Amino acid sequence: MLSDIEITHLAKLDHISKIGAKLGLGEDDMELYGKFKAKIEPRLDGSNSKLILVTATSPTPFGEGKTTMSIGLADALNRLVKKVCLALREPSLGPVFGIKGGAAGGGYSQLAPMEDLNLHFTGDFHAITSANNLISAMIDNSLYQENPLNIDKILWKRCMDMNDRALRFITVGQGGKADGVEREDGFNITAASEIMAILCLATSLADLKERIANIMVAYNDRGEPIYVRDLGCEDAVCILLKDAMKPNLFQTIEHTPTLVHGGPFANIAHGCNSIIATKTALNLADFVITEAGFGSELGAEKFIDIKCRVAGIAPDAVVLVSTIRSLKYNGGADKESITKPNMSALEVGIANLGGHIENLKQKFGLNVVVALNKFGFDEDSEIDFVRDYCAKFGVKMAVCENFVKGGEGALELANFVLEELKKPNDMKFAYETSDDTKSKITKIATEIYGAGEVVFEEAAQKALEKIKKLGLEKLPVCIAKTQYSFSDDAKLLGRAKGFKFSVKDLQIRTGAGFIVAVCGKIMLMPGLPKTPSALNMHIDTKTGEISGLA
């Protein structure tokens, strides 16, 4: 089979104006960035369109194909002559050159041109990086200009859209008095910046400016919070993000319209594309497919409890992506053997699928279809076993081969989803906003994850007191934990239950409007692997054609 980039190079793409026309957009509605991408003005009016959320079971380290499945489903609905639009996240440059490679789907379910998407795109990430670093520059300038705000403990870090471990802990201002105040600092990757989360949760330019003004960047020498509004640069930061607030129009290789906008981390943030892009897609199309990062206990929970609360939306159906290999992995098979027949591991690991189905149907009240992303090494007996297991929950399972067949390989899934969309849906939240912070975290950990006990460590206890003192207990919570387990232990696979769940610390994100519960090690600036993907990339200096971008 051809590589991803070879497939996209052979695809005959439509001019972006033709893609926009499918959504009723005229030339004056689009700001073109070449032939194949454009920015459009947000459209946030009410809509009766159907929203389909794509999530997944607990993944292997290889990922299970949520984006590929989202694209395949959209292309399948497009083949059924439905007015459909995807609403997806933008990829970060760091993983592109690191271990993961590109993030535009895979095989014959891809966004294209994939090199445009993976490399710079329309410059949104650069605008977010600049906005983040303007705040850093203002903080350091305030320190240099005799520190009128009495800044003491600084919370804010610089950012860059690249994997570079050497920047995690640095010292700035080493050149002497003329070059600023010497202090410890560090860089996060741009996707981990609070600015990214803010961009994706803001519902208007006015809301964006207010959220920026509310970012807590430091404490003064009396322990009182200092905000961006105290620095006085909220307008300047907002100006840098003015165009980045507009969704980006793109296409699949089967010419399905796609809005690609924003890309927050799925652990320390909510892991979803922007509210503006999702609501604009709902305004323009009859069926909108979006996704949430990691497994459903992380991504879908945050989509519902954070994004849906802010946006006033709810999914009409959920597609739960799984693979035979991930279920074997959750049943104890190692990474080297998950491609081989192993019914005993599958019989144990399938409880992971059951846990995700139960949460989505019973805890969140949503209609579910399971999408089995089929690989060539999957056995028919294994597929039948998973299908029969899903039937016990009253859930249909579609076998999906869109990676090799494009939209045609997801037609069964599309038809199952259309059936579910006819049924009533009653979305429920995991907690109420009136619950205090500790109760919110405890409800998620016990009801969604399956914990038997929740322990708040000393730093978390102190943070709870500070949150209460600042009057922030009504904020939603965003739990940062491993994606490989329902628990906070990456090695506790399957459907873990009754475990002790430890909350190490709480981080206040007053701009984004949530509290991050740290339940494990958080890596905000990744490093490159021993053999980075960058080493496999090449460019033809005569034609400019890129190869090796996978």
Swiss-Prot record:
GO terms for biological process: tetrahydrofolate interconversion. It catalyses: (6S)-5,6,7,8-tetrahydrofolate + formate + ATP = (6R)-10-formyltetrahydrofolate + ADP + phosphate. The keyword Ligase applies. Gene3D superfamilies: Domain 2, N(10)-formyltetrahydrofolate synthetase (3.30.1510.10), Formyltetrahydrofolate synthetase, domain 3 (3.10.410.10), P-loop containing nucleotide triphosphate hydrolases (3.40.50.300). Pathway: One-carbon metabolism; tetrahydrofolate interconversion. The keyword Lyase does not apply. It is an enzyme of class 6 (ligase). Its EC number is 6.3.4.3. Coiled coil: none annotated. Keywords: ATP-binding, Ligase, Nucleotide-binding, One-carbon metabolism. CDD domains: FTHFS. One of its GO terms (molecular function) is formate-tetrahydrofolate ligase activity. ATP binds at T60, P61, F62, G63, E64, G65, K66, T67. Belongs to the formate--tetrahydrofolate ligase family. This is Formate--tetrahydrofolate ligase.
